[in-house]
Every structure is written in structure tokens, then in C-alpha cells.
UniProtKB/Swiss-Prot annotation:
<feature type="domain" description="HD">
    <location>
        <begin position="351"/>
        <end position="444"/>
    </location>
</feature>
<keyword id="KW-0255">Endonuclease</keyword>
<dbReference type="InterPro" id="IPR004088">
    <property type="entry name" value="KH_dom_type_1"/>
</dbReference>
<protein>
    <recommendedName>
        <fullName>Ribonuclease Y</fullName>
        <ecNumber>3.1.-.-</ecNumber>
    </recommendedName>
</protein>
<keyword id="KW-0694">RNA-binding</keyword>
<comment type="similarity">
    <text>Belongs to the RNase Y family.</text>
</comment>
<keyword id="KW-0378">Hydrolase</keyword>
<dbReference type="GO" id="GO:0003723">
    <property type="term" value="F:RNA binding"/>
</dbReference>
<keyword id="KW-1133">Transmembrane helix</keyword>
<dbReference type="InterPro" id="IPR022711">
    <property type="entry name" value="RNase_Y_N"/>
</dbReference>
<feature type="region of interest" description="Disordered">
    <location>
        <begin position="99"/>
        <end position="126"/>
    </location>
</feature>
<feature type="domain" description="KH">
    <location>
        <begin position="225"/>
        <end position="285"/>
    </location>
</feature>
<dbReference type="Pfam" id="PF12072">
    <property type="entry name" value="RNase_Y_N"/>
</dbReference>
<dbReference type="InterPro" id="IPR017705">
    <property type="entry name" value="Ribonuclease_Y"/>
</dbReference>
<keyword id="KW-0472">Membrane</keyword>
<dbReference type="GO" id="GO:0006402">
    <property type="term" value="P:mRNA catabolic process"/>
</dbReference>
<dbReference type="InterPro" id="IPR003607">
    <property type="entry name" value="HD/PDEase_dom"/>
</dbReference>
Length: 535
């Protein structure tokens, strides 16, 4: 039993040992198999990675080669295109050159043909002139032949008549012929003497005028219609214009002067044909720039102030001019009226300076001729006084000036000089003739007057006069070189519904009465202002 048990135990032990041994071998085999598998997988991975890298290298090489081929092909294409373009441009250039040469040849041929045509025309004219000259000469020769034939007939008849005359009849005939010849000679001598006297008198008159001009030596030239005001800097232009243009509109409406603001640095131009308005505008603009306060109320205040200042200056101008020509006892009212001529031009010539110049010339000429030089200067000074108020009073400046001289009891010679200096009435004194000559001399001096400027000013003045003729018009200003007429009306006389009608009527009258280039803008302004003061 124990043996069986021991045997069984031994068998069990053997089985256990065998199992353990087999298990160990099996585990070892499994681990070996797993290691082999891992190695195989690792090798496969390495091979795949190597294959992928080689494939990438091959792909990159292929792409690089492809890009290289593309670039080479593109460069070749560009080179071919460039060569083709150069060939085409060269061909076009050659064709253009040929066209230019052809055009030049055609131009030269045309010029040559024109010259030939001109030459032919000139030759034709010359031939016509020669033919006309030949015809005239032939006609003259024919006439002379006829005259000679007639003279021969007369001589034959005269000889026949003389042959039949007695001694007394022949003597009477000779005396008559001699008397006729002497009469012709005397008439010729008289004409020569008259011509000599005329030449000597002309020379004396010229000598007197030359002496007068040398002693006066006037340097005044034609005035312009613009004034310039210098600005401290360009920023002032914006302040002058004001918000939405209120300042510049107010300034132009109150002064009647165009304000021109352009690209000229630090300058504003004031343009207008009326020198008084332009001077008021200049003084106002300079005062605004100096004061720095630029707004509609301040503009209105300064315009009114400068109008009063101009009135005072007008009197000063008249007094200074009267003293300059030696007439200090002139009536004060006449001095003030003469002062207004400082702001009046005639054909661009300042009328006050013209009057002073005429006075001095008349004084010099009168002195040379032994006349009253003081009275001549006075008459010359006052000869154009009517121009100071001819825009306010009906009549010519000659008529107005004559009435003023009579009103202020001037010397009758002065009155007649004013009335006759344009030939409206007959001159009654030597002084009147002297002043007329001095007036013509001053006006005809080179640079003294400008016909085109006077025509321009007259057109603007006529434009304003047409507007002022309508009832209810307060004042009017011709602006923009006559391209616009701006009309201010009395608000109590012209209502809003009448403004358009007034503009239409003014436009119609301008079209019927004036000749002008382009268009004229008619602007009617009705302003109703209410002012009160809080106390």
C-alpha cells in the first residue's frame, strides 16, 4: 500500500515536474515567437519607411525636373515673344519713319505749291499793275496828243488872227497877255507868302507848346479798375469769405465791388469801375484786416465810416488842387465838387489830375502869349467840373459845368471857356482857345487815356442806369466785369411777388438797349431788416 502510494506520489510528482518543464519550454517558445514577430514587424516598418523615403526622393526629383522643364519652356517662350515684339516694333518703327518721311515730303510739296501759288499770284498782280500802268500811260499819251493837236490848231488860228491885226490892236493884245501873266505871278507870290506865314506861325505855336510841355512834364498815365490789398497770410482769405460766404456777400453788396480771391498768395483783388466805391472797399478791407473782427455787422459799420471819411478827403483833394494851380480864393463848394473828380476817370485818365494839367498848360501858354495866366489857369482848372456830377444831374458835363460857373458867379471868360471847350458854342476870348488847346494836348499825350477802358466803364455805367430807372430800386451794382447786375430794392415798395417781375423787366430792357457779349445775370435782392435795442 505504501508502495502504491509512493508510486502514485512519484507519478504525480513526475507529472508535475513534466508539466512544469513543458510549460517552461512552451513559454520560452512563445516568447521566442513573439520576439521573432516583433523583429519582423520592425524590419517591415523600416523597409516601408525606407521605401517611402525613396519614393519621396524620386517624387521630389521628378517635380524638380518638371519645374525646371517648365521654367526652361517659359523662358524660351518669353524670349521668343520678346524677339517677336522687337521685330514687330522694328517693323512698326520703320513704317512710322516711312510715313513721317512721306508726310514731310507731302508737307514740303504743299509748301512749295503754296509758294508757287503765291509767286503766281504776285506775278499776276504785278502783271495787272503793269498792264494798268501801261494803259494809264497810253491814255495819258493819247490825251497829250489831243492837247498838242488842239494847241497847234489854236496857234494856227492865233497866227492867222495876229496877221490880220493892226499895230494898235497888236499892242493891246500884248499888254493884255502881259497883264494876265503878271496877275498869275502876283497870285503865286501871295500864296507863297501866305504859306510862309502859316509855317512860321505853326512853328511858333509848336515852340510855345513844347515849352509848356517841358515846364509841366506831366507823368500821369491811365488808371486801372483794380486795387490789391495785401494779406498778413493766406489763412485770412477764409475769414474774408466767411461761413457759407456771408462775409464776402455782405462786403460786395454794401460796396458794389467784386472781391476776387484766387491762387495769388497773400493778395486779395478788389475790382470795380467806380473809383469811389473801390477806394471805400479798399479802406474797409484794410481796416477789417487790421482789426481782425470780420463779420457782416462790422463790415457794415466800417463801410459807413469810410463813406464819411471819403467825403472829408474829397474836400481836401479839391482844396489841395486849387492851391496847386494858384486859385485859393475858389468858392468852397466848387473846391468840394472839384475834389470829387479825384475819383472820376475819363478814358482811364484821372479827371482831377487832367484838370490840374490843363490849368498849368493853359497858364504857361497864356503867359507866352501875353494873356492873363492866372485867369487861364482858373478856367483850365474848372473846364471839366461838370463831370463831377454828370451822373446825378441831367445834361452833358459842358452844360452842367457852365451852370455851376454861373451859379457861383465865376468870371464870364471862365463861363465861356467851359461852354466852348468842346466846340458847343463859339469861343469869345483867347483864353477859351488856349484852354481848348491845353485840354486837347493833355488828353492826346501818350499814356494819358485808354479808349477801351472808357468804353468798358461806360457800358457798366449804362447797365446800372437801366436798373436804377425802375421804381422801387434803391441802388444797383454792376459786378463781374458787367456779367452781373445786382439790384437792391426798397422792401416797402417791392414785395416778394414783384421781385421776379422786376428781374424780368430789367433783363428785357437790357436786351433791348445794350449791346454786350455773352450773358448778363440779373439778381434782385429784397432785404427786410428789423432792429431794436434792449435797455
Amino acid at each position: 500500500m505504501e508502495m502504491i502510494f509512493a508510486l502514485v506520489f512519484a507519478v504525480i510528482i513526475g507529472l508535475v515536474i513534466g508539466y512544469v518543464s513543458i510549460s517552461a519550454r512552451m513559454k520560452s517558445s512563445k516568447e521566442a515567437a513573439e520576439l521573432t514577430l516583433l523583429n519582423a514587424e520592425q524590419e517591415a516598418t523600416n523597409l516601408r519607411g525606407q521605401a517611402e523615403r525613396e519614393a519621396d526622393i524620386i517624387l521630389k526629383d521628378a517635380k524638380r525636373e518638371t519645374n525646371s522643364l517648365k521654367k526652361e519652356a517659359l523662358l524660351e517662350a518669353k524670349e521668343e515673344a520678346r524677339k517677336y515684339r522687337e521685330e514687330v516694333e522694328a517693323e512698326f518703327k520703320s513704317e512710322r519713319q516711312e510715313l513721317k518721311q512721306t508726310e514731310s515730303r507731302l508737307t514740303e510739296r504743299a509748301a512749295s505749291l503754296d509758294r508757287k501759288d503765291d509767286n503766281l499770284t504776285n506775278k499776276e498782280k504785278l502783271l495787272e499793275q503793269k498792264e494798268q500802268s501801261l494803259s494809264d500811260k497810253t491814255k495819258y499819251i493819247d490825251e497829250r496828243e489831243e492837247q498838242l493837236a488842239e494847241l497847234e490848231k489854236q496857234k494856227e488860228a492865233e497866227l492867222e488872227r495876229v496877221a490880220s491885226l493892226s499895230q494898235n490892236e497888236a499892242r493891246d493884245l500884248i499888254l493884255a497877255q502881259t497883264e494876265e501873266k503878271l496877275t498869275k505871278e502876283i497870285a503865286m507870290r501871295i500864296r507863297e507868302a501866305e504859306q510862309e506865314v502859316k509855317e512860321r506861325s505853326d512853328k511858333m505855336a509848336k515852340d510855345i507848346l513844347v515849352q509848356a510841355m517841358q515846364r509841366i512834364a506831366g507823368d500821369y498815365v491811365a488808371e486801372q479798375t483794380n486795387s490789391t490789398v495785401h494779406l498778413p497770410d493766406d489763412t485770412m482769405k477764409g475769414r474774408i469769405i466767411g461761413r457759407e460766404g456771408r462775409n464776402i456777400r455782405t462786403f460786395e453788396s454794401l460796396t458794389g465791388i467784386d472781391v476776387i480771391i484766387d491762387d495769388t498768395p497773400d493778395v486779395v483783388t478788389l475790382s470795380g469801375f467806380d473809383p469811389v466805391r473801390r477806394e471805400i472797399a479798399r479802406m474797409t478791407m484794410e481796416a477789417l484786416l487790421k482789426d481782425g473782427r470780420i463779420h457782416p455787422a462790422r463790415i457794415e459799420e466800417l463801410v459807413e465810416k469810410n463813406r464819411l471819411e471819403i467825403d472829408n478827403r474829397i474836400r481836401e483833394y479839391g482844396e489841395a488842387a486849387a492851391y496847386e494851380i494858384g486859385a485859393p480864393n475858389l468858392h468852397p463848394d466848387l473846391m468840394k465838387i472839384m475834389g470829387r473828380l479825384q475819383f472820376r476817370t475819363s478814358y482811364g485818365q484821372n479827371v482831377l489830375r487832367h484838370s490840374i494839367e490843363v490849368a498849368k498848360l493853359a497858364g504857361v501858354i497864356a503867359g507866352e502869349l501875353g494873356e492873363n495866366a492866372t485867369l487861364a489857369r482858373r478856367a483850365g482848372f474848372l473846364h471839366d467840373i461838370g463831370k463831377a456830377i454828370d451822373r446825378e444831374v441831367e445834361g452833358s458835363h459842358v452844360e452842367i459845368g457852365t451852370e455851376l460857373a454861373r451859379k457861383y458867379k465865376e468870371n464870364p471868360i471862365v463861363v465861356n471857356t467851359i461852354a466852348s471847350h468842346h466846340g458847343d458854342v463859339e469861343a469869345e476870348s483867347v483864353i477859351a482857345v488856349i484852354v481848348a488847346a491845353a485840354d486837347a494836348l493833355s488828353a492826346a499825350r501818350p499814356g494819358a487815356r485808354s479808349e477801351s477802358l472808357e468804353s468798358y466803364i461806360k457800358r457798366l455805367h449804362d447797365l446800372e442806369e437801366i436798373a436804377n430807372e425802375f421804381d422801387g430800386v434803391k441802388t444797383s451794382f454792376a459786378l463781374q466785369a458787367g456779367r452781373e447786375i445786382r439790384i437792391m430794392v426798397h422792401p416797402e415798395k417791392i414785395k416778394d411777388d414783384k421781385v421776379t417781375i422786376l428781374a424780368h423787366d430789367v433783363r428785357e430792357k437790357i436786351e433791348n438797349n445794350l449791346e454786350y457779349p455773352g450773358n448778363i445775370k440779373v439778381t434782385v435782392i429784397r432785404e427786410l431788416r428789423a432792429v431794436d435795442y434792449a435797455k
